[in-house]
Amino acid sequence: MEYTDNPRKILGRVDVIYSDTEISKDIQTTESGNSAISHPDEVFGAYLVPTVKGCTMDGNATMDGSFQMMDDSVVLGWWSGSLSGSSGVFANAPWIEISFVKRPIISWVVLGDEKRNEYPVDFILQYKRDGKIVHSDSVTVNNQIQVRLTPQLEDITSIRLTITKWSKPNACAKILKFYDRMMERYEGDAIEMFEVSEEMGAADGNYNIVSDTMTVNIFNKDRKFDKGYLRSLMILDRKLLPSIGIETDGEVKYQPLGTFYSDEWQINQDSQWVKCSAVDRLMRLQKKTYVGFPLTENASLYDIAADILLNIGETADTFVISNDLKSVIVPMAFLPKGTAWDALQEIANAGLCKVFVNREDKINVRSEKEPKTTTAIRIDKSNMFSYSSSVSLTEFANRISVEYCDVSLSDDTVEAVSVELNIEPNASLELTLDYNTEVAYPAMETDNLNVLLTDFQGGVNACSVVAKNKTAQKQKAVLMVTGKAIEITTKSLTMQDDDSVRNNGVTEYSHPSSDLVQSHAQAEYIARILLERMHAGEGVITTTWRGNPKLNLGEKYESEDRFGDSQELVCEYNKFTFDGGLKQETRGRTI
């Protein structure tokens, strides 16, 4: 069965992850002891296999070439400080305890070292509620690397693992994982409906950053959300993963629709349904501070975008940036301190980019030049409920104005900020200082040689630094940041469609300014693209149809109206509504 079939059987489901290593920032561990190299915080990570087969000097490693030396860069989990005896029994049983906010424990995992084939043989798990043991699980004669226990407990705040016997003699305990996420899947009668909206650009056609949303109504079985085991987890940032599926030859193939984080829970005692509203992770960027991009000559928009994302904790595998932005060079690039959201909006304005999160939960910075995949999806009167075409005032213009700037530096060094500190004996202060003026190439100095300045990161309007008192006496110090003053001269370029102006009069659009547009060529490119897009008659087509979740943002599809006229569109917006069946609203822009 395909999504184009009629009739068809559509299924929907929503996985809600109430606790995992990403969204649970409160997790802590305590241990009886640690080996010289030990990473107890890794036991609640997502690791299933150590980085290396660690070489040890306890007689349990050989020179066969399979063992490797270790350092703190490897993933290995918790290695205890005590060794087992000749029979594997510990004279002093090592333990590790993990604590967290109150949560139910449906299942729990204990994972040893797969590469070394080592694991706990005899061990005890103690489940605690506010420090008091409420349940224990004792395991003996275990011979498995991984053990999953299912205690089914409520309101647990910590769990202790005590190991009395190990699988190898004269060896420390090696626990890679001591954690399990809390996840429930809702499908069938457990879901009344859900709605997912994904968008790569606003309807007005501006280049900007857009956050996706979803809502779901879940059956409050046995009142578990307000009176049962989930009541303590009705908090923000729980992870939701909606999917749409279709049954083919007795097998359901699901299409994930993204990852969202709970923004609001509505639990009405007069209703059997709980409503959850959620947003994608882009919304978090409004609360994340980006220290800024220091003035750098000939930096590309690609490098600046990557710097923003890496500095707020993203990694190279959690975002995608259009490669053509590497060729957009900014002669004197800089960004001031601000939110990561605002910084990415600057990239969008300067490079004509859409910033959004795709269904793989990756942040996309996609330029207008990004190649668009063609699909076989077609919307016509056979699968369409409604069709509308719109060209708003914000989507039509025949004269485009784009600002660009020249950036230069003063010859003189100026003071950006000066601050007086009192630092306690042997203490360190982590400081973030806002400047009084924007400067390039900032440098910091102090009038007190007993104060050590480290980890200085200087931007154009703010900096961060660690100031350490090297003495046993209280110290007073003045910190001063100096640099070259930044001077900006703004220019404007105007481009128009002469024929349209003669026929229709002038309708002008001014593109949002950005200090990252610093060349006439880039301003001309922006104006030309905008003029092409804002021709009369080139608006957006919005259709409501039977739907196919295989249509992704940025992909091309064919749309035919009720009069038989067809055109190729680029998908910029989808809204999926599942209530036992599927309905989809799609907005596409003419190419």
Range-by-range predicted roles:
Residues 283, 303-307, 341-349:
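Solvent-exposed, polar/charged alpha-helical surfaces in well-ordered, non-transmembrane soluble domains
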Residues 1-295, 332-334, 346-352, 413-482, ...:
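Assembly/oligomerization scaffold segments
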Residues 295-303, 334-342:
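Soluble non-cytosolic domains of exported or imported proteins
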Residues 305-335:
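N-terminal export/assembly leaders
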Residues 474-507:
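C-terminal, non-catalytic macromolecule-binding modules
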Residues 349-374:
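Extended amphipathic alpha-helical segments with heptad-repeat/coiled-coil character used for oligomerization
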Residues 237, 552-554:
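Loop/turn positions that initiate beta-strands
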Residues 190-215, 314, 402, 503-536:
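Short beta-strand/loop turn elements enriched in aromatics
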